[in-house]
Regions:
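Terminal connector regions
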Residues: 624-671
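A general structural signal for short secondary-structure boundary/capping elements
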Residues: 381-385, 513-518, 614, 666-668, ...
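Low-complexity, Pro/Ser/Thr- and charge-rich linker/hinge segments at domain boundaries
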Residues: 664-684
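Glycoside hydrolase catalytic-domain context in secreted enzymes
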Residues: 1-625, 644-647, 652, 811, ...
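Extended hydrophobic/Leu-rich segments
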Residues: 524, 560, 694, 698, ...
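N-terminal hydrophobic targeting/anchoring segments and the immediately downstream early-domain regions
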Residues: 1-75, 80-90, 94-96, 102, ...
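Polar-face residues of amphipathic alpha-helices and helix-prone low-complexity segments
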Residues: 826-961
Length: 961
């Protein structure tokens, strides 16, 4: 049966259901017509399949091989390695019954502070596109689909679900869409995932220009577009704009909205049919349910975790970058070597959030080093917090004096970078910097191995002899680090991002993470090395930088240009005495350009392996896009006629060969800005663009950056937004406790900061039916000071009472100081007391009711009101200081220290002895009749309480009368 024929047999309700998930990971099915579901799963550097379909959490996932995260994979600059990795992941997916893996993530690294940079490839769109394409080809070669993400301009975690990226079209096309375009055209991914954020005021999930005009009409994408989890705001608008599938399930909420929109004439059913067709085509590709295409017979997938771990180790070696080496590496196993830092024994191998993998095995660098030699160890500092421990530091420095060489394992703790929030600074923990400085003061041979997902500042860089950037290297990172330290393998990775000296040096320093409503991309095209070269800024380590244990020479450049294309040939020789791999990079620059441009841009690269003394000729082809820029006025890519320079080098700052060529073509530009109109982009600093200049570039006025203080809270606002209202400031804590405490979304967002920035509509949609629309409406009404008493009663009827439920506590607090008129009336009235002293069956119930009556009276008094207000202020302060997180961390650390010291076993043994002693004591008490005496005393106390309660009741009644 043809898919369009099937669509004709579907009811409107079935169509609406098919364009939404069935649960967290599966598409919907229609048994009546034999339409099955397919399964998707998180990635992208390992399979993260949940064992529980209802869970969005990191726990309870299948064991899988954890490869280096995106930052490290990009440092390989190796298309073949990415393709191989994709193939491995594809086989693992097939073995586990997964049809689509959610990756790769190719968002551009606009700022080193983005909390999710560890998952992204590069600051350069060409490199990201090339590596992403190889990854996609590898996965899909195994009969498994990918979901290319996050489309588009999702370059920060702060307010990622609501912020609008204000960005000019040329920058959007050249920097932020370019990698997606390359992958769509060259690798043809089965699906693409839209991002949470808005672009110039429109949610990506509702952006018809982005999803239809650009993606499908211009690029020729014929796959399925799915939402990021919870990224849907207005489902009918999304259907019309080209969003085919909403994930995860909204438990029928979105489906009903789509049905209503079609019936009301607000959504043409043809758009729904298009979305359904895209869903069914994808399902058919992986199930063959129509019997029209069938599914090619596949060999049973082999999930060989041992073999895959070995590949993870090989890829991790290539993913690490030797930033500095003054002859101390590789290590000699005869040396007296000291490892310092907890990461040596407990490596940080991956980032936090939806990409977190349940690893098959982890071998630390300390364990792996035992295969080479005996290594001494000093903890030096904690790897999981920034707390200086003088005793640990003193021990490490003393041991460093006695060693021949010291290797310090440092980097960023988990809490410093994760999905859901951005970093606040580029600093490493001060406890680590202090120990590094202390050791370099007494030990001339010091190596630093870094475990981090994004650039860090290194105030000690000049004082150490070697720096190895290990990134987040996956489960085999410890072995890979040791392989490189001891020369078993030769470092070959190179940076896919610039390491600036300081945060203030970065191009978007003044515009990251932006304002409440918007983030302005005022730096335009000048991201990463494009900016640093534009302004002539010194950097710590340049884009493309990476050292080897050998040296390479470049020679004999020859460029053959043909119309708007060119072929670049040159030779590379291994001039050292060990085998190694070099990454040759080709950059293009335009001389005397009439449009503003970067000094040069990466347009080609090749990784080549050479034996000692071996020489190879490299050939790299440059297509028309290598010489083009995007013209918003012309609505297309244009090539400027004139002279260009081809640069060949070992990094963006280490250019070895140059050749000038001329391209003869027609100048097709319709309208270009002059240097007078955009001085910062032509001759000044793009980091200091005025509002007026940015508006000229945009062609329109800048949108509002914040809401007015008196604007009401809506379902599209966040908990953080609610704080701007009169009552929201006071109720933020209780409302936060209500929603986060009920865990309506599982653990998909792993931190409180991220949760507070999720809009109410996403919380509702992702609750999988555990929150109802009218429940959320009631909360919003409370925040807006509307129908307070009615909403509290309504929420109470939903079972959200004071007994053990956060919302009940919220309602109780609201009643004490909300609607002052009602409170005053109740105080004046003094009525309703008798309802608490009705017929009671026993003295205990009477006492309980009277106690609640007293509390009610207190709540109506100024005393309780002030106490509640003070309590809320204290609660807010605790929230601001993240006291609970710190307390949790302290408890965890105490537990870990107890475990390390063997206290658990000692306590268990002591507990056993106490238990034995307790039994003996109880036996003695029984023999002496003590238990009976205690029981009798208890009865007497109970009788006394009954009498007291009765007397208390009489006093209350008398006072009321």
């Amino acid at each position: 049966m043809e898919i369009r024929e099937i669509i004709g047999q579907l009811t409107l309700e079935e169509k609406a259901a098919l364009v939404g998930g069935a649960d967290a990971w599966n598409t919907a099915k229609v048994d009546r017509l034999g339409i099955p579901s397919i399964r998707v799963s998180d990635g992208p550097h390992g399979l993260r399949k949940t064992l529980d379909d209802a869970s969005l959490g990191i726990e309870d996932t299948v064991k899988a091989v954890c490869f280096p995260s995106g930052a490290g994979l990009a440092a390989t600059w190796n298309r073949d390695a990415l393709k191989k990795l994709g193939g491995i992941l594809g086989r693992e997916c097939r073995a586990e019954g997964v049809d689509i893996i959610l990756g790769p993530a190719v968002n551009i690294k606009r700022s080193p502070l983005c909390g999710r940079n560890f998952e992204y490839f590069s600051e350069d769109p060409y490199l990201a596109g090339q590596l992403g394409s190889a990854y996609v080809q590898g996965v899909q070669s195994e009969g498994v689909g990918v979901s290319l993400k996050h489309f588009a301009a999702n370059n920060q975690e702060k307010r990622r679900m609501t912020v609008s990226a204000v960005i000019d079209e040329r920058t959007l096309r050249e920097i932020y869409l370019s990698a997606f375009e390359e992958i769509v055209k060259s690798a043809k991914p089965d699906t693409l995932m839209c991002s949470y954020n808005k672009i110039n005021g429109t949610y990506s999930s509702e952006n018809g220009w982005l999803l239809n005009e650009v993606l499908r009409n211009e690029w020729g994408f014929d796959g399925l577009v799915m939402s990021d989890w919870g990224a849907v705001c207005d489902r009918p608008k999304g259907v019309e704009a080209g969003l085919d599938l909403e994930m995860p399930t909204s438990s029928g909420l979105s489906a009903q909205k789509v049905v209503d929109a079609v019936i009301d004439g607000k959504l043409d059913e043809k758009y729904l049919d298009i979305a359904v067709e895209h869903v069914l085509k994808l399902v058919d590709k992986y199930t063959g349910f129509t019997n029209a295409t069938g599914v090619a017979e596949k060999e049973p997938a082999v999930f060989d975790r041992v073999a895959d771990h070995k590949d993870a180790r090989r890829i991790a070696r290539e993913a690490m970058v030797l930033l500095k080496n003054e002859g101390v590496l590789p290590l000699n196993k005869e040396q007296k070597i000291l490892f310092v830092g907890e990461f040596a024994k407990k490596p940080r191998i991956q980032g936090g959030g939806s990409s977190h993998i349940n690893c098959t095995r982890i071998i630390s660098a300390y364990e792996a080093s035992a295969r080479h030699t005996k290594v001494d160890y000093a903890k030096g500092f904690s790897a999981f917090e920034d707390k200086i421990d003088d005793e640990l530091a003193k021990e490490a420095i003393q041991k460093a004096k006695e060693a021949d060489v010291v290797v310090i394992f440092a980097g960023l703790p988990d809490v410093f970078e994760s999905e859901g929030y951005d970093r606040k600074h580029m600093r490493m923990p001060q406890c680590q910097n202090r120990v590094i400085r202390g050791i370099t003061a007494v030990q001339p041979n010091t190596v630093v191995v870094l475990h981090n997902g994004s650039p860090v500042s290194m105030p000690w860089a000049d004082d150490v002899n070697a720096i190895l950037e290990a990134y987040l290297g996956g489960e085999a990172s410890g072995e890979a680090v040791v392989d490189l330290l001891f020369g078993v393998a030769n470092p070959s990775g190179k940076l896919a991002e610039t390491f600036p000296n300081t945060l203030k040096d970065t191009p978007c320093y003044n515009n990251f993470p932006g304002n409440r409503l918007t983030v302005e991309y005022r730096e335009g095209l000048f991201v990463g090395y494009r900016y640093y070269e534009k302004v002539g800024a010194e950097v710590l380590f340049p884009f493309g930088h990476g050292l080897s244990y050998t040296t390479f020479t470049y020679d004999s450049i020859k460029v053959i240009s043909d119309n708007k294309k060119a072929k670049v040939k040159f030779k590379i020789k291994n001039a050292g005495n060990v085998a190694g791999s070099e990454i040759a990079q080709v950059y293009v620059s335009k001389l005397d350009s009439k449009v503003y441009r970067a000094v040069k841009e990466l347009k080609g690269f090749e990784k080549v392996s050479l034996k000692p003394g071996e020489e190879k000729e490299i050939e790299i082809e440059l297509d028309e896009r290598a010489f083009s820029y995007y013209s918003p006025a012309a609505g297309k890519w244009l090539t400027e006629p004139g002279k260009y320079v081809i640069h060949v080098g070992a990094s963006s700052a280490d250019i070895r060969l140059r050749e000038e060529i001329t391209i003869d073509c027609e100048d097709q530009e319709v309208k270009r800005f002059s240097p007078e109109e955009l001085p910062s982009y032509y001759t000044g600093s793009p980091a200091c663009v005025s509002s007026e200049e940015f508006e000229r570039l945009l062609g329109e006025e800048l949108p509002a950056t914040d809401k007015e203080p008196d604007e009401p809270v809506t379902i599209h606002d966040t908990l953080e937004d609610a704080k701007r209202t009169k009552w929201g400031k006071r109720l933020y804590g209780p409302v936060y406790s209500l929603i986060s405490g009920r865990k309506v979304m599982g653990n998909h967002v792993d931190n409180d900061w991220g949760f507070s920035e999720i809009p109410f509509h996403s919380i509702l949609n992702m609750s999988q039916g555990r929150l109802k629309p009218d429940t959320v409406d009631a909360v919003i009404n409370l925040l807006n000071d509307i129908d307070v008493a009615d909403n509290i009663r309504f929420l109470g009827n939903r079972g959200m009472t004071v007994t053990g439920n956060a919302l009940g506590a919220l309602g109780e607090k609201i009643l004490t100081y909300k609607n002052e008129r009602q409170v005053k009336e109740m105080n004046d009235n003094n009525s309703g007391m008798d309802k608490f002293v009705n017929t009671l069956e026993n003295a205990g119930e009477k006492l309980g009711e009277i106690g609640r009556d007293v509390i009610d009276r207190l709540e109506k008094s100024d005393l309780m009101k002030k106490a509640n207000e003070a309590g809320l202020k204290i609660g807010e302060k605790i929230d601001e200081l993240h006291f609970s997180e710190k307390l949790d961390g302290a408890v965890s650390r105490a537990a870990q220290k107890a475990e390390d010291a063997g206290l658990k076993d000692k306590i268990d043994a002591l507990g056993g002895k106490l238990g034995d002693a307790g039994e003996s004591i109880m036996k003695k008490l029984e023999e002496n009749g003590v238990q009976e005496k205690l029981k009798e005393a208890g009865n007497q106390i109970e009788e006394g309480l009954k009498k007291a309660a009765s007397g208390f009741e009489e006093k209350i009644k008398g006072k009321n009368e």
